[in-house]
Amino acid sequence: MRIAGIDIGSRSMELVVREPDSASGWTTTVQRRLPTTFDPVRQCRLLLEDCMPDRIVATGYGRALVQDMDLGVPVETVTEIRAHALGACHHFPQARTVLDIGGQDTKAIALLPGGKVGRFEMNDRCAAGTGKFLEYTATVFQMDVASFGAYAMLGTEAPVINSMCTVFAETEATSLMAQGVKPENIALGLHQSIVRRTVNMLRRVGLEFPLVFAGGVANNPCIRDLLARELGADSGSLLIPDEPDMGGALGAALWGATSLG
């Protein structure tokens, strides 16, 4: 029995395939990622190429698309909140809170004993505080988002960025440049604005440590550093998976295995 978890997000889609293993129960045999693009159905078929499972569990914005694709195997769905909670707890069973910052949304999840979901909050109505915010504002500095975090870490004094609207934040950054503020300091201020918003979300759901930080934005070194400092968290209380953007797909696959009984 091969179970695939697919997480179809607005920016990318991830696949995790798990199979029974005599030593450990289940093991991950496939991990893949593709951009979602404007044709998510085609991309999903490419993602599954040469590894068609016996069962699929889909999560993310596009999970309903997978059910309509006539893939010839049973397909079910699981909510993003539950999938990300399962993925985080698989890596870190001691986790008490999960923060997932993706391309278009931010999820803060408080966990109950046993990894069950307690309170949660999700910002999915605008790009503020998400990977899209970083991607958009990075263009002001004429650089790609992959380099933006390291550049922001060169800053020494972060100006306060008051607007969390992506468009207005770009205008504010441009205005600060015109005032002679160092670009690397502005970049640091933009990162700090995300962290402030995120920490407020975490506190509203009832932050407890250890905190698992996942999602594509967890790859940003500046966000990681600022979040740890803002929370006063050490390496034992702020936990980051080796592949932080695979958590949703992993959680979906885990859900599929669990629901088999």
Label the model's feature ranges.
Residues 2-46, 117-126:
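Short glycine-rich, Thr/Ser-proximal phosphate-binding strand/loop in the N-terminal lobe
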Residues 3-7, 55-58, 96-99:
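Short glycine-aspartate micro-motif
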Residues 44-46, 66-102, 107-115, 119, ...:
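Conserved phosphate-binding catalytic cores of ATP/NTP-utilizing and phosphoryl-transfer enzymes
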Residues 61-62, 207-230, 244-245:
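Glycine-rich phosphate-binding loops at beta-strand->alpha-helix junctions
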Residues 74-81, 227-250:
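Conserved phosphate-binding/catalytic loops in two-lobed NTP-binding clefts
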Residues 86, 131-135, 239-261:
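Glycine-rich phosphate-binding/hydrolytic loop that grips phosphoryl groups
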Residues 116-157, 162, 254, 258:
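Glycine-rich phosphate-binding loop plus the immediately following alpha-helix
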Residues 169-203, 245:
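Adenine-nucleotide phosphate-binding core of ATP-dependent small-molecule kinases
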